Amino acid sequence: MSWDQVWIDVNVATMDPSISAPYGAITHAAIAVKDGKIAWLGPRSELPAFDVLSIPVYRGKGGWITPGLIDAHTHLVFAGNRANEFELRLKGATYEEIARAGGGIISTVNACREADEAALFELGRQRLNALAKEGVTTVEIKSGYGLDTETELKILRVARELGKHHHVDVKTTFLGAHAVPPEYKGNSDGYVDLIINKMLPAVIKENLADAVDVFCENIAFNLEQTERVLSAAKAAGLQVKLHAEQLSNMGGSELAARLGAKSVDHIEYLDEAGVKALSESGTCAVLLPGAFYFLRETQKPPIDLLRQYGVPMVLASDFNPGSFPICSTLLMLNMGCTLFRLTPEEALAGLTLNAAKALGIEDKVGSLVVGKQADFCLWNIATPAQLAYSYGVNPCKDVVKNGKLVHQ
């Protein structure tokens, strides 16, 4: 057989739902890669003969291979920090109180408006490197810290450049509707007009976004405004998604389902009607345990209802300067299990196959199947559950991206 590389002495958590074993596991397995894709996958005993002297053969020493991790919700490109707000919250101030007083998102907006693209790129590169070392091979990056045309474009350009200069694939999301900027205080409808009539066309002209997002919440944008932005995005051929039901239930999830959104994110206050709507539309539920933890929230997402209705559950870091400034995707496995009571298998699916669904790329990545992109990680673990069970010593040994060994 003519392959580019072969991996043997491994166990594989394929996350392929057509395999009935937990994690879609194949033990004592082998993987062959050709032209950046998985060319063969199965038990080592069934691997066709090949010339071991002509291609690289990697021995996994009994470790586990999983699909490359996918972080489907980050705000990775930003300047400044909000450590002072961290102190205020610990003294009793709420996230909403800080935002209404001009802190929160707006303080980061001011820092991003002042930063140039080179500075933002370097900050983003360092953060992307940190995620890559944890086995992340695809990441979504949102804008939303500009809130004017120039800075929103600047953030999205930086995100696109990161994808061009890093082995991690970057999917970009335009989140101009993240908050109402100070210059539009008391005129949120006017700002929505700006998003639709000026910002979005500029984003589309430069091909800077794969999707459009809106923060649908009392402190941000109402249902009517949210629908206006997302409808304009859909009309332009972009995917849509939504921050919703984080602080209250405004019915954003039902709106997202009606619009065919790829995902609804946060959803702590999601009710059964919203869950049913997501199930019927095939919209993913993105769980963000890091923000739940960091903000010391008490309202948990309706995990049992999501299971009951078969809604794909995604885990993501929500890495951002305000509600989760901890740059770790791997930590979400443990948090998803301990805080939201996911099983380790559900948690891993949330960072692989279901995360790919949330980004609309499940035909290429998210599970290990012949013909899909060869994005995978070798972990120094005895069982896949160990990824969720333990944290602190990074067990990621090797990372393959598009068939190339990029981290060893």
UniProtKB/Swiss-Prot annotation:
Entry's family note: Belongs to the metallo-dependent hydrolases superfamily. HutI family.
Sites where the protein binds 4-imidazolone-5-propanoate: R82, Y145, H178, Q246, S323
Protein name per its UniProtKB record: Imidazolonepropionase
InterPro entries registered for this protein in UniProt: Amidohydro-rel, HutI, Metal-dep_hydrolase_composite, Metal_Hydrolase
Source species, domain of life: Bacteria
Cited function: Catalyzes the hydrolytic cleavage of the carbon-nitrogen bond in imidazolone-5-propanoate to yield N-formimidoyl-L-glutamate. It is the third step in the universal histidine degradation pathway.
GO biological process, one term: L-histidine catabolic process to glutamate and formate
Pfam families registered for this protein in UniProt: Amidohydro_1
GO cellular component: cytoplasm
Cofactor: how bound: Binds 1 zinc or iron ion per subunit.
Positions contributing to N-formimidoyl-L-glutamate binding: Y145, N320, G322
Keywords from the UniProt entry: Cytoplasm, Histidine metabolism, Hydrolase, Iron, Metal-binding, Zinc
Catalytic activity: 4-imidazolone-5-propanoate + H2O = N-formimidoyl-L-glutamate
Binding site for Fe(3+): H73, H75, H243, D318
Gene name of the encoded protein: hutI
Positions contributing to Zn(2+) binding: H73, H75, H243, D318
Cell compartments where the protein resides: Cytoplasm
The enzyme's E.C. designation: 3.5.2.7
Cofactors that this protein relies on: Zn(2+); Fe(3+)
Listed pathway(s): Amino-acid degradation; L-histidine degradation into L-glutamate; N-formimidoyl-L-glutamate from L-histidine: step 3/3
Top-level EC class: hydrolase
A GO term, aspect molecular function: imidazolonepropionase activity
